[in-house]
Amino acid sequence: MSGKKRTASSSRWMQEHFDDHYVKLAQKRGFRSRAAFKIEEIQEKDKLIRPGMTVVDLGAAPGGWSQVAVKLAGDNGKVIACDILPMDPIVGVDFLQGDFREEKVLDALLTRVGDAKVDVVLSDMAPNMSGTGGVDQPRAMYLVELALDMCHQVLAPNGCFAVKVFQGEGFEEYMKSVREAFKTVKTRKPDSSRPRSREVYLVATGYKL
């Protein structure tokens, strides 16, 4: 029975995916994923990225956010991306493949950033979901904590941070930590985010050293 249920659920997901307006639109516009529209919507509201900025994109693969970021940052900007999964090259994006949870990967990423401060940290990281909330939520919260730690290491004064967070245990405490580090924090649920998803995006501006 469980196998049949999984098969039916998978079929529903596939149908939803291929019928998805944003998936079709992503294909039409040459975006690598529907996630590109999430950062576009956030950018439209919050104007995080401007020409000449340095941006770090965590959880970048397959590259939807990096595509948007590199276009906004322009020729004089810099985009440094990282993901545990491989990502096809994007012109203007310096990509590091590795597990961000590992110290050696963080060190390699910091080396690529160099001495200059970063203007924007983006994180669309998420763990592989098991379907068990008691397992998935702590894993997801650990990743967003690491992303906030990255901000503390590289972000310039008044810098910005946009991070995907799953609502659940630890969310309110995390929100408090972000509010302590930034002047303004807003919660965004982009139209391109599936309604049934628990994901929201915290958009923080005005980093306080």
Curated annotation (Swiss-Prot):
Subcellular location: Cytoplasm
GO molecular function, one term: rRNA (uridine-2'-O-)-methyltransferase activity
SUPFAM superfamilies given in the database record: S-adenosyl-L-methionine-dependent methyltransferases (SSF53335)
Gene: rlmE
Catalyzed reaction equations: uridine(2552) in 23S rRNA + S-adenosyl-L-methionine = 2'-O-methyluridine(2552) in 23S rRNA + S-adenosyl-L-homocysteine + H(+)
GO cellular component: cytoplasm
Lineage of source species: Bacteria, Pseudomonadati, Pseudomonadota, Gammaproteobacteria, Alteromonadales
EC number(s) per entry: 2.1.1.166
Swiss-Prot/TrEMBL keywords: Cytoplasm, Methyltransferase, rRNA processing, S-adenosyl-L-methionine, Transferase
Domain of life (superkingdom): Bacteria
Annotated S-adenosyl-L-methionine binding sites: 63, 65, 83, 99, 124
A Pfam family assignment: FtsJ
Known role: Specifically methylates the uridine in position 2552 of 23S rRNA at the 2'-O position of the ribose in the fully assembled 50S ribosomal subunit.
Catalytic residues (positions): 164
Main location (coarse class): cytoplasm
Family: Belongs to the class I-like SAM-binding methyltransferase superfamily. RNA methyltransferase RlmE family.
Protein name as catalogued: Ribosomal RNA large subunit methyltransferase E
NCBIfam families found in the cross-reference section: PRK11188.1
Keyword Nucleus: no
PANTHER family: RIBOSOMAL RNA METHYLTRANSFERASE, RRNA METHYLTRANSFERASE 2, MITOCHONDRIAL
